[in-house]
């Protein structure tokens, strides 16, 4: 598709506008870049913390978020702080959050939407997980899913991730691969006075029901991998003509959520 050369630029621009996103080490203070996070009350404590791919982090800023809230955060970690003495033994790191933004959350749902026709005001998705983003990660039951969509700026979109609950996996290289279908539909028609452009979005989809359904079909957590299908081209003159794209196999391990220690 002729727009795909825009994806890398758009994605980098969006992430940079949220936070500083380069890995850096300044005076022994570490910033791992923009990171996906799920807010939880940690263990038996009353402290609200965030589960990240780096482990559990704590900041007083997290107290303003509810249990299970999905965020993108940028934080500094200073191992020399007294609060971080024996951090590994305590099970969490005290950090300074430099910026955070909430992520749209919803459930992966069944049944599968009709793949032979478009949704009302469906928008083409240019890419899923563009540039192999580090923000594509499964935390607990949430799959953080970066996507790039071709639409008009500031146009509200409804995203959905659906699946066939009775599907049987395709087995490749001893991996059991299941299919999820990502779609985006605008809530309103196309504004006449606005040009279309590539828009980068991150959604967090709860895969709890998907994992449960696949396990009931005989799937095992250790073998559950996914491909994500998405409509990548729509003929603007004939909406019956559209094509499906598909991601490479995701080796994000789809284990069922384990509660925090």
Question: Language-model segments: which ranges?
Answer:
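C-terminal motif of bacterial Sec signal peptides marking the signal peptidase cleavage site
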Residues: 18-21
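Start-of-domain marker
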Residues: 24-89
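Bacterial N-terminal signal peptides that target proteins for export
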Residues: 2-9
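Short acidic/polar inter-strand loop motif in beta-rich domains
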Residues: 79-84, 231-239
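Conserved small/polar residues in nucleotide/adenosyl-binding loops
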Residues: 252-261
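Short helix-loop boundary/capping segments
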Residues: 129-194
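Short, solvent-exposed, Trp/other aromatic-anchored flexible loops in extracytoplasmic proteins
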Residues: 187-222
């Amino acid at each position: 598709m002729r727009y795909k050369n825009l994806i890398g630029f758009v994605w980098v621009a969006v992430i940079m506008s949220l936070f500083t996103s380069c890995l850096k080490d300044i005076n022994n203070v570490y910033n791992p870049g923009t990171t996906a996070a799920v807010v939880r009350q940690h263990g038996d404590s009353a402290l609200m913390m965030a589960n990240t791919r780096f482990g559990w982090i704590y900041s007083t800023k997290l107290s303003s978020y509810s249990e299970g809230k999905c965020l993108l955060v940028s934080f500094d970690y200073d191992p020399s702080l007294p609060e971080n003495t024996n951090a590994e033994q305590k099970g969490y790191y005290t950090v300074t959050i430099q910026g955070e933004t909430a992520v749209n959350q919803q459930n992966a749902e069944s049944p599968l939407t009709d793949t032979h026709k478009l949704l009302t005001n469906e928008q083409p998705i240019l890419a899923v997980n563009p540039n192999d983003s580090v923000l594509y990660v499964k935390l607990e039951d949430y799959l953080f899913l970066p996507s790039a969509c071709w639409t008009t700026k500031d146009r509200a979109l409804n995203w959905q991730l659906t699946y066939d609950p009775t599907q049987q996996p395709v087995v490749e290289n001893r991996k059991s691969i299941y299919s999820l279908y990502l779609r985006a539909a605008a809530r309103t028609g196309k504004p006449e006075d606005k040009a279309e452009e590539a828009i980068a979005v991150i959604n967090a989809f709860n895969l709890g029901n998907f994992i449960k359904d696949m396990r009931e079909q005989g799937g095992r957590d250790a073998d559950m991998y996914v491909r994500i299908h998405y409509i990548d081209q729509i003929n603007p003159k004939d909406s019956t003509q559209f094509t499906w794209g598909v991601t490479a196999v995701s080796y994000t391990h789809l284990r069922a959520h384990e509660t925090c220690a």
